[in-house]
Swiss-Prot record:
GO terms for molecular function: amino acid transmembrane transporter activity. Gene3D superfamilies: Amino acid/polyamine transporter I. Residues 1-50 form a transit peptide. Permease involved in the transport of the cationic neutral or acidic amino acids. Belongs to the amino acid-polyamine-organocation (APC) superfamily. Cationic amino acid transporter (CAT) (TC 2.A.3.3) family. Keywords: Amino-acid transport, Chloroplast, Membrane, Plastid, Transit peptide, Transmembrane, Transmembrane helix, Transport. This is Cationic amino acid transporter 6, chloroplastic. The chain crosses the membrane at residues 63-83, 91-111, 132-152, 186-206, 216-236, 255-275, 294-314, 347-367, 397-417, 418-438, 450-470, 481-501, 509-529, 541-561. InterPro entries: AA/rel_permease1, CAT_C. GO terms for cellular component: chloroplast membrane; plasma membrane. It holds the Pfam family AA_permease_2.
Length: 583
């Protein structure tokens, strides 16, 4: 039985009193059956759901703004570390091929985001895409995990800014931080610089999206200039012999010292350097011409970043033999050990500092817009959905998440934070690719979704089997046979689906090519990368996933049910997925 009471505005509320709320909890099963897999429609997301925010975001961004935001979001300080680590441990000089492969895969995954963003130009990004496809709870589960990943990552990035700033000025990090006795290790180093950076960026993104884009453009231009400078210095000082000859003759030699396995292991490691383009899709509501600007902005930024990464990889591989590369600070260490070139180390620190600021700005823009649209769905308080009438930005969401990020950055050690990021982002990429296939092959209305759902499940299982074989089975002929067999099965599954199940709809404006192969590659890649993450990542994912489920059970499902009863959601729309499953 649904238990509701009137709120002050004449609507229904499950939270008007403790008694009403406790009675509402008894209706949780029936509300779950109605709301958990209820889908919204594109027209509702563009009209009634957007209206929850009151004011509208201004459409002021063009394709070049999106390219700048995409580059700024992807090219952070991490590339200065990831390149050396992947080259030293996995790929050797062939790290440039690893970056090219990872860039191609990132582009395929970005295509999935682009089709949704063109069709549904709202600020919700992946949350909105999954909500119109799989329903409310899957959208909240993935979106909330992504927001937590954003917050953790931004806190980690802001603390690393202190370290790179110290490198640029030749000052030890300990001079910028102070230790508080009595606090547990990992939480006792206070970093006021990180807090200041987060709060300043929070103020910037609250003031104006257009001005934020201009600030990002300026900092990104400086960052790219520093990167090109380091690349040129690497080519000048480097030696092409290092592309094939290790320092130790006993180590594997050649351009591919670790073979194909090393190239793909390297690609898996450096793929995380491309994370950031998804934040561009959250800006869709503020783009002047989404049909034209979003495909150019997203694809263009990924392509440019791929070229930059490949040039950096070649430059670094020429600087030193791969077995002498410092996996923690490859460029800085290479120049620091050369007479007369130590000053380049400070240039690297300055460039990395700009990269941190741009990636932090873009990520904080993205996390606020995710939170804003989650608030529009009412599964979190719709206070987060409010748009400021003067700035046309989600000030409430930006301020709340900015303060939360600053609090984490103040106390929490970088290594603690880094163990908590990445899995949510990869999981969202995986869900968006699945959602795109489902949306293309399952029409809205009474129909049978099971062939598509079975295909997605079988392909995911096969991809997981391939990943486990790659990670766990020792090298040898049995491993090669098992990998080949699982690959053949995966290809056969896709071919069978393509032949048996016709596309139910084709996009009118912009669509992903080579369906369903393109999103399938994205699904496989994200499962493969999820399999490469360490145990603490899954502990974090399980912990926060449990919290998210509890929030939905004790708040979200009741708040969205109230919104439906008050007319914020269409009853017909809320029944679409339920009707699909009942067929």
């Amino acid at each position: 039985m649904e238990v509701q009471s009137s709120s002050n505005n004449g609507g229904h509320s499950s939270f008007s009193s403790l008694r009403v709320y406790l009675n509402s909890l008894s209706a949780t099963p029936s509300r779950l059956s109605r709301r958990a897999i209820s889908v919204s429609t594109s027209s509702d997301e563009m009209s009634r759901v957007r209206a929850v925010s009151g004011e509208q975001m201004r459409r002021t961004l063009r394709w070049y703004d999106l390219i700048g935001l995409g580059i700024g979001g992807m090219v952070g300080a991490g590339v200065f570390v990831t390149t050396g680590r992947a080259s030293r441990l996995d790929a050797g000089p062939s790290i440039v091929v690893s970056y090219a492969i990872a860039g191609l895969c990132a582009l395929l995954s970005a295509f999935c985001y682009t089709e949704f963003a063109v069709h549904l130009p709202v600020a919700g990004g992946a949350f909105s895409y999954i909500r119109i496809t799989f329903g409310e709870f899957p959208a909240f589960f993935t979106g909330a995990n992504l927001v937590m990943d954003y917050v953790m990552s931004n806190a980690a990035v802001s603390r690393s800014f202190t370290a790179y700033l110290g490198t640029a000025f030749g000052i030890s990090t300990s001079k910028w931080r102070f230790v508080v006795s009595g606090l547990p290790k990992g939480f006792n180093e206070i970093d006021p610089v990180a807090v200041l950076v987060v709060l300043v960026i929070t103020v910037i993104i609250c003031c104006s999206t257009r001005e934020s884009s201009k600030v990002n453009m300026i900092m990104t231009a400086f960052h790219i200039a520093f990167i090109f400078f380091v690349i040129v210095m690497g080519f000048i000082k480097g030696d092409s012999k290092n592309l094939s000859s290790p320092a130790n003759p006993e180590h594997p030699s050649g351009f591919f010292p670790f073979g194909a396995a090393g190239v793909f292991n390297g690609a898996a490691m450096v793929y995380l350097s491309y994370i950031g383009y998804d934040a561009v899709s959250t800006m869709a509501e503020e783009v002047e011409n989404p049909v034209k600007d979003i495909p150019v902005g997203v694809s263009g930024s990924v392509a440019i970043v791929t070229v930059l990464y490949c040039l950096m990889a070649v430059s670094m591989s020429m600087l030193l033999p791969y077995d002498l590369i410092d996996p923690e600070a490859p460029f800085s260490a290479a120049f620091r050990g050369s007479n007369g070139w130590e000053w380049v180390t400070k240039v690297v620190g300055i460039g990395a500092s700009f990269g941190i600021l741009t990636s932090l700005l873009v990520a904080m823009l993205g996390q606020a817009r995710y939170m804003c649209v989650i608030g529009r769905s009412r599964v979190v308080p719709f206070w987060f959905a409010k748009i400021h009438p003067k700035t046309s930005t989600p000030v409430n969401a930006s301020t709340f998440l900015g303060i939360f990020t600053a609090a984490l950055a103040l106390f929490t050690d970088l290594n603690v934070l880094l163990n908590l990021v990445s899995i949510g982002t990869l999981f969202v990429f995986y869900m968006v690719a699945n959602a795109l296939i489902f949306r293309r092959y399952v029409p809205v209305g009474p129909t049978k979704p099971w062939p598509t759902l079975c295909f997605l499940t079988l392909f995911s299982i096969t991809s997981l089997v391939f990943t486990l074989i790659w990670k766990l089975v020792p090298e040898g002929k049995p491993k090669a046979f098992m990998l080949g067999a699982s690959a053949v099965v995966a290809i056969a599954i896709v071919l069978s689906f393509q032949c048996v199940v016709p596309q139910a709809r084709k996009p009118e404006l912009w669509g992903v090519p080579f369906m369903p192969w393109t999103p399938c590659v994205s699904i496989f890649l994200n499962i493969f990368l999820l399999g490469s993450l360490d145990a603490p990542s899954y502990v974090r994912f399980g912990f926060f996933s449990g919290l998210i489920v509890l929030v939905y059970l004790f708040y979200g499902v009741h708040a969205s049910s109230d919104a439906e009863a008050n007319g914020s959601f269409g009853v017909k729309d809320g029944q679409v997925m339920k009707e699909l499953i009942e067929v």
